[in-house]
């Protein structure tokens, strides 16, 4: 921090002042303000002065400078406080809150915006879509709530007219997962009337000035706010503080877009605009006395009934009911009889105003609840997702003193008294009491305790709110003057209360109207006029029923209490003051349960002028905020305190005497040894149960040592844990394998027993178990089952063939080979007849030339030395020249011969059998065979001149050739096709079969590029 801010900028922390006096404090504050340094620390409390101008202190670059840094490492800034709260939440799993306080116009709302922007910028590094959605809603909600809850006042151009406390929920990684907004005491009386120089809520002016002409026409509105009673006071004013802020026209578009991003449907946005327009029209309704009857009860009428039409249309309610609700009210008598009582003009005006205030309040509450419904964390389970942590941001109205202060200012200032009391308890009172309790020597600091002022307001039975509630609940006529007299009677001796009756010489107060409270921030005179009425916050049930019965679902949802029966007797509702007191008590309890961070905002001048600091005005704020006392406590106190056990739990790994567990006499002794090893014992004090650390630098030193050791410890723990997991896994696997082994044994035994039972009769001929159904094996036994099935098939085949004579085995093997080669693609392949193989040597097939063939066969055997004849038959062949000849085919174990039967079976062609690579046949009953040989033309033949005629011998040729190839260990390629491709001298041709009934014997027909076998069909 000192590197970036030199002495010319003053002290960045008021604790560093040489002398703690008001003069030194103000001198340092003014110097820093003049140098553009609007932020200054008091320890961890940030003092912020509103500059009333844009300063280059914000944005992504500034966020990067403060992200992850300690408070003292950078100049004072809102980002530093936001970062400290975020780190405390993320690293220590502590719920934290940032309390932003100060009077109206001190810059609290802007401070809360910058805090939200910082949190949104530093979270969700992994860009999760759900987290981005939540961040967008958090940021956009501020824009929407400002439109409906902020207004221009004489002290602030963008004053929050409601209190806001926002909880932001974070997951264990520190990413926002949701949030919740609590609103407090909307100043709904502003809807009706504003002081000179002030405006109504921004939403009305944004609607009138930012809507398109078409939308204004549909809403029956004019663009000029001066036309409407509720907005004419501020019609000539704008919401802008200076030229950098958006105008009403631009803000309307920004708010509409923000509502869309948050999740408001187009219908809901339209309903909101209609409700705002209805309120404006309602404010223009005037009542006049007439002599007519009918709906205009007792001579009361609406001056301009077109306004009633507009209100009825915009609220989606019947016109007659709207008019009746304005002119009269329904009362249930004791006998549950309904009586309609007409209003006077004054009563009707009161009812109209009460309705307008209530509708706007319900609209604001609905907007807040709608935003909350979008922001609520979804699907969170602490057992699965871990504990959520929270950062709360409190932006609530500041202390207010107006020329005329009413019930709203009384509640606002009571709220500030409660927050000041919390600040005193947490920062001043509790701190000093803890030092005394722990036996820490220090210099006591005197401070003003405002508990007596809080007690004056909220004390049961005698407090101002209790007296006000009693006045509201009394059966008789109790006026505001009587209420004031009761206050005077109860508090005439109270040091912080006075009135004109108690102090007749004080002519600044009006007799019978004013009382004064000496607040911690100064004296405020309150006018009791309207106190009872505003506290009752009464609205006739007729309006509630009217709006509940609206056909607009958005408006209807705002009035659930309108559904109760008109004759139903209900409990008296809590008053506005009591509700506000209860909400303040709950808020303070909520804040007290969190680790607080404070931003104390100071308003530099009443003129809202940049660069001007009114010393007297600021001195007064410094005094009532207790900042000087805070400096004294901070200088005399300690930056941090922790129980010894918690301190050891976090830092014990930084000392050899305390890691992993110490053996010293007590935690206090262990902490002392740890600090002594680091050389930090001079900056701490030892209490009875806690360690008090004076400087934040000591904590940072310990945190840095811890951060260096954490990766090593994590690796050690990971190694140990992974080893444990591996051992657990190993033991489980061993147990699993043992169970699997025994289970498999059981399943194998059971399966084998079942197989044995089923196959007891498998040896019985002639089926040998062919009809037996195999049991379904377990998956693990499937390979075993497959092996058993293969063995069974081999055994059964053996049983079937063992009785076949050895002489028939070659024929059986050939048939098996043919069946495998043809794969069932040929209709008939002669498996049912006996295969003779050598048909040319048979006198039956070759009666005239069998002896001649035998001589030729002997000659070839002597010449080529083959061992056996595999197949022989007469064939009819066609060659590449389209010549058709009768030939003989001889297949031996070494050669394939083509013989000429007309020339004593002379050899026309001899092909080595090893060159034959395959053959092609058709799927029909014809005898066409195409033999394929390596490096030779394909041989196209048709088996011919068989006995009986047209006997099917193709399967026999395929079988003997395939069986021989299997015996040699090579594969014969057999193709079955009705259109067979063949090759002659490299020319591709096709051959097909054409059955002909009139064909006497097989023959070939040649065409260009193809052949056709003409086959006699039987």
Curated annotation (Swiss-Prot):
It comes from the Eukaryota. Specifically expressed in hematopoietic cells. Residues 824-1017 form the TH1 domain. Changing residue 898 to A: Reduced membrane association. ATP binds at residues 102-109. PROSITE patterns: MYOSIN_MOTOR, TH1. One of its GO terms (biological process) is actin filament organization. Changing residue 903 to A: No effect on membrane localization. The keyword Methyltransferase does not apply. The keyword Membrane applies. Residues 584-606 are annotated as: Actin-binding. The modification N-acetylmethionine is found at residue 1. Residues 710-739 form the IQ domain. Pfam families: Myosin_head, Myosin_TH1. SUPFAM superfamilies: P-loop containing nucleoside triphosphate hydrolases. It is found in: Cell membrane; Cell projection, Phagocytic cup. Signal peptide: none annotated. Keywords: Acetylation, Actin-binding, Adaptive immunity, ATP-binding, Calmodulin-binding, Cell membrane, Cell projection, Immunity, Lipid-binding, Membrane, Motor protein, Myosin, Nucleotide-binding. It is a peripheral membrane protein. Belongs to the TRAFAC class myosin-kinesin ATPase superfamily. Myosin family. Interacts with calmodulin; via its IQ motifs. Unconventional myosin required during immune response for detection of rare antigen-presenting cells by regulating T-cell migration. Unconventional myosins are actin-based motor molecules with ATPase activity and serve in intracellular movements. Acts as a regulator of T-cell migration by generating membrane tension, enforcing cell-intrinsic meandering search, thereby enhancing detection of rare antigens during lymph-node surveillance, enabling pathogen eradication. Also required in B-cells, where it regulates different membrane/cytoskeleton-dependent processes. The myosin tail domain mediates binding to phosphatidylinositol-3,4-bisphosphate (PtdIns(3,4)P2), phosphatidylinositol-4,5-bisphosphate (PtdIns(4,5)P2) and phosphatidylinositol-3,4,5-trisphosphate (PtdIns(3,4,5)P3) and binds to membranous compartments. It is required for recruitment to Fc-gamma receptor (Fc-gamma-R) phagocytic cups. This is Unconventional myosin-Ig. The lineage of its organism: Eukaryota, Metazoa, Chordata, Craniata, Vertebrata. The gene is MYO1G.
